[in-house]
């Protein structure tokens, strides 16, 4: 898949072929290296490539998985689940993973995770977990930046190109239906680009524009991956993000800017 990126040229999105079902303990960087070699038209890797890896396979490889049959839900989780036809055990896992509960009403549970992400269900997810997914859920990786860094270092060692890596996940957005992929971990790029103080196309100085470039790349990759196609990894070629040793924490808005709390 390719799209016109305007003045920056053309952006290509290449989904990797042959990534197998990931299980806990798998050497994910090595598996991704094998998939890169198998994907027609991908090699040689280029300096303007960005590797986007979906959270689910990172979590599975790192054994960030909970067996719901081992969970004893608290009364609050049971009451919420019974009222809104939810699984009390999954609600309990979400509450355990939460730094704080932002909203818990009308069947919706929005929390702040220990990473600082504010999202539905704290990133706890029962989809695409594997053959026994009826009683398993995945958690977000403990340190998504570290996960991205390990993949980046392995790719650099194997292919000799320092390719930035994004770990992506699907988030909702306030006041809009639907989900889109965003970056939850990065290595080798700066997740946001502060354009304040630079002139726009008409010469006016921009005063508030901060570009979420890592989120844009993660969302672009999802166009080639899809939610049910079984393709969890893509190369986004030509996006040209701002390179550097950034952290996903750079993209998290401080609490004092919260207008809805």
Task: List where the protein language model places each region.
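N-terminal and secondary-structure boundary signal
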Residues: 1-261
């Amino acid at each position: 898949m390719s799209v016109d990126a305007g003045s920056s040229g053309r952006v290509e999105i290449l989904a990797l072929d042959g990534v197998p079902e990931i299980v806990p303990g798998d050497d994910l960087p090595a598996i991704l290296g094998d998939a890169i070699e198998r994907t027609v038209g991908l090699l040689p890797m280029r300096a303007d490539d960005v590797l986007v890896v979906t959270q689910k396979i990172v979590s599975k490889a790192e054994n960030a998985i909970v067996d719901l049959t081992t969970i004893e839900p608290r009364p609050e989780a049971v009451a919420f689940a019974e009222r809104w036809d939810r699984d009390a055990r999954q609600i309990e896992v979400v509450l355990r993973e939460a730094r704080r509960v932002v909203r818990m009403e009308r069947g919706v549970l929005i929390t702040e995770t220990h990473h600082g992400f504010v999202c539905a269900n704290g990133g706890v997810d029962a989809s695409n977990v594997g053959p026994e997914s009826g009683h398993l859920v995945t958690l977000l990786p403990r340190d998504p930046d570290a996960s991205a860094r390990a993949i980046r270092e392995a790719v650099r060692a194997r292919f000799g190109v320092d390719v930035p890596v994004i770990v992506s996940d699907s988030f909702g957005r306030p006041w809009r239906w639907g989900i889109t992929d965003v970056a939850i971990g990065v290595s080798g790029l700066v997740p946001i680009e502060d354009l304040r103080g630079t002139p726009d196309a008409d010469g006016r100085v921009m005063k508030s524009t901060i570009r979420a470039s890592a989120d844009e790349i993660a969302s672009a990759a999802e166009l080639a991956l899809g939610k049910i196609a079984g393709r969890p990894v893509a190369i986004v070629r030509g996006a040209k993000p701002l390179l550097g040793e950034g952290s996903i924490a750079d993209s998290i808005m401080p609490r004092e800017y919260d207008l809805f709390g």
